[in-house]
Amino acid sequence: VRGGGKVEVELPRPSADFQDVRVVAYPASAVGRAALTAADTRVTAAGTAAGAQCLIDGDPATELLFDGSPEAVIDLVTDADLDLRNITVWPARRPIRAEAELQVKGADGYRTIASFGIDRSNPNIEVGFYPYAPVSVSVAKTTGREFRLIVRGAGKDTGFAEVQLSSLPRVERYAEKTFAKMFQSPLPYWEEYQWRDQPVLDDASLAVDPAEVVDITECLDGDRLVWEAPAGEWVVMRTGMRPTGIQNSPAAPEGTGLEVDKMTPAYLQHHFDAFI
């Protein structure tokens, strides 16, 4: 939102059972070009169905499916330089496990700047409440106009909904780090929740400064935000919680239901007194 006066806006509620925790705002990053878009980028692909342009249309309902070839190649070409710092892939709503390689074209041809796995093979919410969560991978600042994403081992009729190449930094593997998407079997090995250090950010001004984050929770009434915003461009973030949908198991039918909130002592005590 643009500050310098009163801001009045309806904030979307993710679901009926959503419970607000905090509404915060922070200054938007001052970057000239945030990401490749459908308006400035041409997308072509081999080893897929037709219609690769849907990968950057901003609509997760449109999907590009792979045809079962051992390798699929997706080229994204733009007319102006992009300072790439992150790639985020939104899988199609179909189980997928594959290996990916991101390349940029230079004077000597394409070179690889990131290799990463994509594992959304188990959509059961027992292993993450966001079954087809995006895969976020950071790269050291890389400037280019022609990028290539090579996908190997993806099965026929799996695919991607969106591919975002961005100049803005993003936490790598944030879905996994917040347990929105966990290890894909119930028995992870010890190393499954360890991650590499992502590349050091080259421009500190692109990161959110904690000192500049403003708590505007009291400005929210229902779904309507009314805020006297300071001058500048601001990002408003509504945060909250909702049940994951996981039910306790094993249990007798009369004892089956949503798991108790183990982070709130009063609720946990009530559960203990009622059932133990």
Which residue ranges define each predicted feature?
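Disordered, acidic Ser/Thr/Pro-rich linker "stalks" and the adjacent N-terminal cap
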Residues: 3-81, 92-96, 115-129, 169-210, ...
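Extended, low-complexity, turn-rich repeat/linker tracts enriched in Gly/Pro/Ser/Thr and Asp/Glu
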Residues: 91-98, 155-157
